[in-house]
Amino acid sequence: MYCLFCQHTDTRVIDSRVSEDGATIRRRRECEACGERFSTLETIELKLPVIIKKDGGREAFDGRKLRTSFDRALQKRPVAEERIEMAMRAVIHRLRMAGEREVPSIVVGECVMAELRKLDHVGYVRFASVYRSFQDVADFREEIEKLESELLVSREQLPLLEAVMESIGHPSIDQGG
Protein backbone atom coordinates (compact mmCIF):
# COMPACT_ATOMS: atom_id res chain seq x y z
CA MET A 1 0.00 0.00 0.00
CA TYR A 2 1.31 3.45 -0.82
CA CYS A 3 1.92 6.13 1.82
CA LEU A 4 -0.80 8.75 2.12
CA PHE A 5 1.80 11.40 2.94
CA CYS A 6 4.69 10.90 0.50
CA GLN A 7 3.15 8.41 -1.98
CA HIS A 8 6.02 5.94 -1.41
CA THR A 9 4.95 2.42 -2.37
CA ASP A 10 6.34 0.55 0.65
CA THR A 11 4.57 0.64 3.99
CA ARG A 12 4.72 -1.94 6.72
CA VAL A 13 2.02 -3.11 9.10
CA ILE A 14 2.96 -2.42 12.72
CA ASP A 15 -0.32 -3.48 14.36
CA SER A 16 -3.50 -5.32 13.33
CA ARG A 17 -6.75 -5.62 15.26
CA VAL A 18 -9.96 -7.42 14.37
CA SER A 19 -13.22 -5.59 15.11
CA GLU A 20 -15.64 -7.01 17.66
CA ASP A 21 -17.94 -8.35 14.97
CA GLY A 22 -15.02 -9.92 13.09
CA ALA A 23 -15.95 -8.21 9.82
CA THR A 24 -13.23 -5.55 9.80
CA ILE A 25 -9.48 -5.47 10.41
CA ARG A 26 -7.84 -2.21 11.46
CA ARG A 27 -4.18 -2.03 10.49
CA ARG A 28 -1.69 0.55 11.73
CA ARG A 29 0.91 1.19 9.02
CA GLU A 30 4.23 2.99 8.86
CA CYS A 31 5.87 4.36 5.72
CA GLU A 32 9.33 2.95 5.03
CA ALA A 33 10.42 6.23 3.41
CA CYS A 34 9.06 9.09 5.55
CA GLY A 35 8.17 7.27 8.79
CA GLU A 36 4.60 8.66 8.92
CA ARG A 37 1.94 6.40 10.40
CA PHE A 38 -1.67 5.92 9.36
CA SER A 39 -4.49 3.43 9.79
CA THR A 40 -6.38 1.41 7.22
CA LEU A 41 -9.55 -0.64 7.50
CA GLU A 42 -10.03 -3.88 5.64
CA THR A 43 -13.50 -5.27 5.12
CA ILE A 44 -14.77 -8.32 3.34
CA GLU A 45 -16.01 -7.46 -0.10
CA LEU A 46 -19.04 -9.48 -1.06
CA LYS A 47 -21.13 -8.84 -4.11
CA LEU A 48 -24.26 -6.89 -3.33
CA PRO A 49 -27.32 -6.88 -5.56
CA VAL A 50 -27.90 -4.26 -8.23
CA ILE A 51 -30.54 -1.74 -7.12
CA ILE A 52 -33.55 -1.20 -9.38
CA LYS A 53 -34.56 2.43 -9.04
CA LYS A 54 -38.15 3.72 -9.15
CA ASP A 55 -37.67 4.90 -12.73
CA GLY A 56 -36.54 1.41 -13.78
CA GLY A 57 -32.86 2.33 -13.99
CA ARG A 58 -30.29 0.07 -12.41
CA GLU A 59 -27.22 0.97 -10.41
CA ALA A 60 -24.70 -0.80 -8.24
CA PHE A 61 -25.37 -0.72 -4.52
CA ASP A 62 -23.62 2.32 -3.05
CA GLY A 63 -22.71 2.12 0.63
CA ARG A 64 -22.11 5.88 0.68
CA LYS A 65 -25.77 6.49 -0.18
CA LEU A 66 -26.79 4.17 2.64
CA ARG A 67 -24.49 6.07 5.01
CA THR A 68 -25.90 9.41 3.86
CA SER A 69 -29.44 8.17 4.52
CA PHE A 70 -28.57 7.24 8.10
CA ASP A 71 -26.57 10.43 8.67
CA ARG A 72 -29.38 12.70 7.48
CA ALA A 73 -32.04 10.89 9.46
CA LEU A 74 -29.95 10.84 12.63
CA GLN A 75 -28.38 14.29 12.34
CA LYS A 76 -27.99 15.81 15.83
CA ARG A 77 -29.57 12.75 17.44
CA PRO A 78 -27.94 10.96 20.40
CA VAL A 79 -27.14 7.72 18.57
CA ALA A 80 -23.70 6.16 18.99
CA GLU A 81 -21.65 5.68 15.83
CA GLU A 82 -21.26 2.00 16.66
CA ARG A 83 -25.04 1.51 16.63
CA ILE A 84 -25.32 3.28 13.27
CA GLU A 85 -22.61 1.03 11.84
CA MET A 86 -24.42 -2.04 13.16
CA ALA A 87 -27.68 -0.87 11.58
CA MET A 88 -25.95 -0.32 8.24
CA ARG A 89 -24.40 -3.79 8.42
CA ALA A 90 -27.86 -5.22 9.17
CA VAL A 91 -29.28 -3.60 6.02
CA ILE A 92 -26.38 -4.90 3.92
CA HIS A 93 -26.74 -8.35 5.48
CA ARG A 94 -30.46 -8.44 4.60
CA LEU A 95 -29.69 -7.49 1.02
CA ARG A 96 -27.06 -10.22 0.73
CA MET A 97 -29.29 -12.82 2.35
CA ALA A 98 -32.10 -12.03 -0.07
CA GLY A 99 -30.02 -13.99 -2.56
CA GLU A 100 -31.21 -11.85 -5.45
CA ARG A 101 -29.01 -10.34 -8.15
CA GLU A 102 -31.31 -7.31 -8.34
CA VAL A 103 -33.36 -5.68 -5.59
CA PRO A 104 -35.90 -2.85 -5.95
CA SER A 105 -34.90 0.36 -4.16
CA ILE A 106 -38.12 0.11 -2.14
CA VAL A 107 -36.67 -2.96 -0.41
CA VAL A 108 -33.58 -0.99 0.59
CA GLY A 109 -35.75 1.86 1.88
CA GLU A 110 -37.89 -0.50 3.95
CA CYS A 111 -34.77 -2.11 5.43
CA VAL A 112 -33.40 1.32 6.37
CA MET A 113 -36.73 2.27 7.97
CA ALA A 114 -36.81 -0.97 9.97
CA GLU A 115 -33.33 -0.28 11.36
CA LEU A 116 -34.06 3.39 12.07
CA ARG A 117 -37.24 2.39 13.90
CA LYS A 118 -35.07 0.34 16.29
CA LEU A 119 -32.39 3.04 16.62
CA ASP A 120 -34.23 6.32 17.05
CA HIS A 121 -37.88 7.20 16.53
CA VAL A 122 -37.16 10.81 15.55
CA GLY A 123 -34.67 9.63 12.93
CA TYR A 124 -37.19 7.08 11.74
CA VAL A 125 -39.91 9.72 11.27
CA ARG A 126 -37.45 12.03 9.50
CA PHE A 127 -36.50 9.31 7.05
CA ALA A 128 -40.09 8.14 6.59
CA SER A 129 -41.24 11.69 5.87
CA VAL A 130 -38.88 11.94 2.91
CA TYR A 131 -39.06 8.32 1.80
CA ARG A 132 -42.86 8.21 1.86
CA SER A 133 -43.24 11.81 0.67
CA PHE A 134 -45.31 13.12 3.57
CA GLN A 135 -47.55 15.91 2.30
CA ASP A 136 -48.74 17.53 5.52
CA VAL A 137 -48.83 17.37 9.31
CA ALA A 138 -51.49 14.66 9.18
CA ASP A 139 -49.00 12.28 7.57
CA PHE A 140 -46.52 12.93 10.39
CA ARG A 141 -49.24 12.50 13.00
CA GLU A 142 -50.34 9.19 11.50
CA GLU A 143 -46.79 7.80 11.51
CA ILE A 144 -46.17 8.97 15.09
CA GLU A 145 -49.45 7.40 16.22
CA LYS A 146 -48.36 4.08 14.68
CA LEU A 147 -45.09 4.27 16.61
CA GLU A 148 -46.87 5.14 19.85
CA SER A 149 -49.31 2.24 19.49
CA GLU A 150 -46.40 -0.16 18.87
CA LEU A 151 -44.65 1.14 21.99
CA LEU A 152 -47.83 0.69 24.00
CA VAL A 153 -48.17 -2.92 22.82
CA SER A 154 -44.51 -3.53 23.73
CA ARG A 155 -45.04 -2.14 27.23
CA GLU A 156 -48.16 -4.26 27.66
CA GLN A 157 -46.15 -7.37 26.74
CA LEU A 158 -43.57 -6.83 29.51
CA PRO A 159 -45.81 -8.10 32.37
CA LEU A 160 -46.65 -11.15 30.25
CA LEU A 161 -42.95 -11.80 29.66
CA GLU A 162 -42.22 -11.48 33.38
CA ALA A 163 -45.05 -13.90 34.21
CA VAL A 164 -43.70 -16.46 31.75
CA MET A 165 -40.16 -16.04 33.09
CA GLU A 166 -41.41 -16.47 36.66
CA SER A 167 -43.44 -19.57 35.73
CA ILE A 168 -40.29 -21.28 34.44
CA GLY A 169 -38.33 -20.34 37.55
CA HIS A 170 -36.29 -17.56 36.00
CA PRO A 171 -35.81 -14.36 38.05
CA SER A 172 -37.84 -11.38 36.91
CA ILE A 173 -36.36 -8.73 34.64
CA ASP A 174 -36.42 -6.22 37.52
CA GLN A 175 -34.15 -8.48 39.58
CA GLY A 176 -31.44 -8.46 36.92
CA GLY A 177 -32.22 -11.90 35.57
From Swiss-Prot:
Chain positions of all zinc fingers (unnamed): 3-34
NCBIfam families hit by this protein: transcriptional regulator NrdR (TIGR00244)
Note describing how the cofactor binds: Binds 1 zinc ion.
Free-text function comment from the UniProt entry: Negatively regulates transcription of bacterial ribonucleotide reductase nrd genes and operons by binding to NrdR-boxes.
PANTHER family, alphabetized: TRANSCRIPTIONAL REPRESSOR NRDR
GO MF annotations in UniProt: ATP binding; DNA binding; zinc ion binding
Family: Belongs to the NrdR family.
Keywords from the UniProt entry: ATP-binding, DNA-binding, Metal-binding, Nucleotide-binding, Repressor, Transcription, Transcription regulation, Zinc, Zinc-finger
Transmembrane segments: none
GO biological process terms, semicolon-separated: negative regulation of DNA-templated transcription
Keyword Repressor belongs to the record: yes
Species whose genome carries this gene: Xylella fastidiosa (strain Temecula1 / ATCC 700964)
Cofactor field: Zn(2+)
The ATP-cone domain, residue ranges: 49-139
The keyword Zinc-finger is annotated on this UniProt entry: yes
Domain of life: Bacteria
Record's protein name: Transcriptional repressor NrdR
